[in-house]
Swiss-Prot record:
The gene is aroQ. It catalyses: 3-dehydroquinate = 3-dehydroshikimate + H2O. The keyword Oxidoreductase does not apply. Its EC number is 4.2.1.10. GO terms for biological process: amino acid biosynthetic process; aromatic amino acid family biosynthetic process; chorismate biosynthetic process; quinate catabolic process. This is 3-dehydroquinate dehydratase. Catalyzes a trans-dehydration via an enolate intermediate. GO terms for molecular function: 3-dehydroquinate dehydratase activity. The active site is at residues 23, 100. SUPFAM superfamilies: Type II 3-dehydroquinate dehydratase. The record marks 18 as: Transition state stabilizer. Keywords: Amino-acid biosynthesis, Aromatic amino acid biosynthesis, Lyase. Substrate binds at residues 74, 80, 87, 101-102, 111. HAMAP family: AroQ.
Length: 152
């Protein structure tokens, strides 16, 4: 069985209430349910983790290498400045795909740069919750099923 960890960063626990004009009315719990439902027929275990604390996210990334085949991460605001999360992502030997619900390139200038993207295989931005599904599909189709070796 393949194991994938989905990490969500700060304020994503406020989805459904926070800036619905940008993020819609969907909650993080709804997103997690949609992801699980989409992959219910796969030989796949998906765990979800959310924290507003940078250190907890870093710890989870570092611990993940022992338990997971890959990570899907939405670092949220940390993506724009957290060298510590970037370093944690670089320190592990499993693939990471970065996801953003909104199109960060259509947002404020300071949101257009993702430092954490440097340690990601790729970034999916602007497709709402479906970005998580796209990331997991990529992982399953290109990394797990074909046994491709991924080098950061």
């Amino acid at each position: 069985m393949n194991n994938i960890l989905v990490i969500n960063g700060p304020n994503l626990n406020l989805l459904g209430k926070r800036e619905p004009d940008i993020y819609g009315n969907i909650t993080l719990e709804n997103i997690n349910q949609k992801i699980k439902l989409h992959f219910k027929n796969e030989d796949l275990k998906i765990d979800f983790f959310q924290s507003n604390e940078e250190g907890k996210i870093i710890d989870k990334i570092i611990e993940s290498e022992k338990k997971y085949n890959a990570i899907v991460i939405n670092p949220a605001a940390y993506s724009h400045y957290s060298i510590a999360i970037l370093d944690a992502m670089r320190s592990i030997n499993i693939p990471v795909v970065e996801v953003h619900l909104s199109n960060i390139y259509k947002r404020e200038e300071y949101r257009k740069k993702s430092v954490t993207a440097e340690a990601s295989l790729g970034v999916i931005s602007g497709f709402g919750y479906y970005g998580y599904i796209m990331a997991i599909e990529f992982i399953l189709n290109n990394l797990v099923r074909e046994n491709n070796i991924v080098v950061h």
